[in-house]
Amino acid sequence: MQSGEESRLGIKCASLHEELTQIVIDQDVGPLQRVPASEFLARLVEHMGQTIPREVFGAEAETGTRDLERLGAIVAYIDENFAAQNVLPFTIQRICELCYHPLHYFRVGELRKFVNALEKVCYVRSSWSAGYGAVPSPAEGTPTREASVDVSMSKIPWLPDDGGRDLRQFIEKIESIVSVNFGYEDDEDEGRDAAIQEYYDNEGAGDDEDDDQDYVDEDSATSEDEEEDVEEEEEEEGPEPEVGLEPVHAESAPEECVGTNKRTTAEREDCHMQPCAAAHSTDGAHPCGLKRSKLQEDGATMASPPDIVAEGGSHDPQVVDASKPPQLTTSATNVSCNASIEATVSLDDDSTAGGE
């Protein structure tokens, strides 16, 4: 046969066991309202700080020093903030559940977990008041609501009757407005669907033909653009030269050097155009006397013209007397003029090289 303490789950105080049983098992908060808060908390914290750690969890002073210190701090906090003011913490029901049967939640040797759970529910500031967390009886409270009743249309306990009627009317207005809007949206959807169906039934084929024509127009426009691009490229590159002909490049006009003996192209052409009637004049001067004298004044030297050999009727070479003017043939005249021109050009090149 079990002893009294074992039947009371380790609770030594019989009155505390009855009160905790009524609160935890019967879900009746009557003891919290009848018994002063200071007396109830004094019995509860003694059981919490002394009996539970040593007799329920079997904690020893040497092994569970840290957990016992934390548990003592919890007891001191409850005495100072609630028992001294004769109020209960608003978590008093959860505290009673943990202290009534701690082995229902924790195993033996799990004192640390028990202390952790107490710290979460004891370190609070709000106090418990009458009716807080109480389960009203059907005679005193609102009758049990059926599952089929709409929650949004149920009565709110703290609103007066007039406010409840106004709230019901307001909700009915909202429902009517919402239903009307939904009706308009349905009509718009039906009209849109009908228009789309009619469009595909009547005008679908014509649109396909128009689309095909658009594709053809785009292809033709693309080909014309390509031809224009090719023509522009040909104009930029210019006409191609004919086969077998080399491109002619314009010669840049020679720059006249001031203070030099360089002859210009016009002076050379004048020398070509002068008639060479005789290879030597009567005074022994060069056919191009003016140019020869100009070169002599500038200090340039010129080689004597080549000896002219007169051709007789028998084609025998005869030496021409220097005292008489020689009678030259057409071929001899041409040779003399060409030799003079070559000599003049060589002098011009030498003078240019000396000036540089």
UniProtKB/Swiss-Prot annotation:
Protein localization: Nucleus
Ranges where the record places region Disordered: 202-335
Regions of compositional bias (Acidic residues) in chain numbering: 202-240
Keyword annotations: Nucleus
One cellular component term from this protein's GO annotations in UniProt: cytoplasm
Annotated Pfam families: PPP4R2
GO molecular function: protein phosphatase regulator activity
Record's compositionally biased regions (Polar residues): 326-335
InterPro entries: PPP4R2 (IPR015267)
Protein task: Regulatory subunit of the histone H2A phosphatase complex, which dephosphorylates H2AS128ph (gamma-H2A) that has been displaced from sites of DNA lesions in the double-stranded DNA break repair process. Dephosphorylation is necessary for efficient recovery from the DNA damage checkpoint.
PANTHER family (alphabetical): PPP4R2-RELATED PROTEIN, PROTEIN PHOSPHATASE 4 REGULATORY SUBUNIT 2-RELATED
Subunit-structure text: Regulatory subunit (R2) of the histone H2A phosphatase complex (HTP-C) consisting of PPH3, PSY2 and PSY4.
Homology family: Belongs to the PPP4R2 family.
Protein name (database record): Serine/threonine-protein phosphatase 4 regulatory subunit 2
Organism from which the protein derives: Eremothecium gossypii (strain ATCC 10895 / CBS 109.51 / FGSC 9923 / NRRL Y-1056) (Yeast)
